[in-house]
Amino acid sequence: MGHENIWYSHPRKYGPGSRYCRVCANHHGLIRKYGLNICRRCFRQYAADIGFKKLD
């Protein structure tokens, strides 16, 4: 059994390892609210394009 069969063989159906940013595929700092599924870094970059407005 080679390492190709073992690597990433654990099922990722739930938990933080199963979700990733739809822009950069990062697992950390994920914003899931409203079904965004974008990490916080990409959200800051694309917030205006999505339609979010920064309030004072």
From Swiss-Prot:
Subcellular location as annotated: Cytoplasm, Cytosol; Cytoplasm; Rough endoplasmic reticulum
The protein's predominant localisation is cytoplasm
Its cellular-component GO annotations read: cytosolic small ribosomal subunit; ribosome; rough endoplasmic reticulum
Q: Where does Zn(2+) bind?
A: 21, 24, 39, 42
Write the lineage as a comma-separated list.
Eukaryota, Metazoa, Ecdysozoa, Arthropoda, Chelicerata
**Keyword Amino-acid biosynthesis appears in the UniProt entry:** no
Gene name per UniProt:
RpS29
Q: How does it assemble?
A: Component of the 40S small ribosomal subunit.
NCBIfam families membership? PRK05766.1
What's the protein here called? Answer: Small ribosomal subunit protein uS14
Show the GO MF annotations.
structural constituent of ribosome; zinc ion binding
Q: Name the coenzymes or cofactors required.
A: Zn(2+)
Keyword Acyltransferase appears in the UniProt entry: no
Disulfide bond sites: none
- Keywords, A to Z? Cytoplasm, Endoplasmic reticulum, Metal-binding, Ribonucleoprotein, Ribosomal protein, Zinc
According to the record, cofactor stoichiometry and binding are noted as: Binds 1 zinc ion per subunit.
Biological processes annotated in GO? cytoplasmic translation
What family does this chain come from, according to its entry? Belongs to the universal ribosomal protein uS14 family.
